[in-house]
Amino acid sequence: FLTGRAMHSCFYSTAYWQKPHELKMDNKIWQGADLIFDLDGDHLPGVTDRDFPGMLDVIQDQAYALWNDFLEPEFGFSEDFLQVTFSGHRGFHLHYRDPALFHLDSEARRELVSHIRGEGVDVQGGLTRYNDAKANGWTKRIRTQIPTLIEKLVLIAERNDEANRIMKDLHLSLKETLRREGKPGKGPTSIQKLADMFLHEERRNAVENGQISRLGALQGLFLDLVKSDASIVLGAAGETDEVVTIDVRRQIRWPTSLHGKTGMRVTEFQFSRLDRDGSNPFDALTEAFVFGRDKNTNVEIVVDDATLRFGENNYDVTLGDKLNVSESAATFLSLKGWAKVVI
């Protein structure tokens, strides 16, 4: 069927029906649905798909952390029911098929997503087990994230070359977290005040050891930043992919099919390969291209700037650049609207 009717993209239902052959949805009789976690790199704070390799690295790390920090230790999910796929474009799917969870309705699935995102999480309470190396979930993420956040705040306080970018990223993440929780927003001025407090070495060391009270009136802001900077991103701008997880009638891309916006294959692989620091990490920009690899196609770049990688070949391109690339690369660039083929 598929070879005879080439189509833009191919999907299948993650729901189970008593009468799937019925034409009307009301007559199919819903029986349950798989759990889908769709992590998409689009619109991540500080990340752009114009740096396509960098974006995929970030979202691959997020997908691995989602399973390693939450789904397995917090919820007891088993790898026996897990299918991992590269979406063919900007992210990864964690497809969980445990029959014991098929019955979960949208509200139950929304609660699961809310916990992962840290909505309503008591970061202050998590500090009670700050030095417990065996703690998982949000306690673990709080413990590991505080030193990282402090490093960022110190760079802001020192007016480092990276200060503006770091400030923008932190502010965007914080703004989204506070919006979801219905809290009043905090601007860059407040973050700058907090950052300046970390120029004091003794205070910095105390906070790194979990003594958040040393920040006085700004400790609440610090804890909100910890939460927002450590949260798992389940969607573009915090919305799109939550819908994927809570939707009990969702369709998802068919593994081995091609993504119509890139020409890349929706690729299934073992969970262990999701770890970029592992012995055999999955590399979408090598493994998901299916067309020719020989450099025999001339293209002209039609966007201002982009960072690209096709296998071992890296490119930093700008408007008007002309490249000789493989059929796979030319297909990707054309479908993305980033280049045109030159005869």
Please provide the spans of the model-predicted regions.
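A generic structural motif
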Residues: H89-G91, S328
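Residue-level detector of short, conserved catalytic/binding motifs and their immediate flanks
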Residues: L35, F92, I252
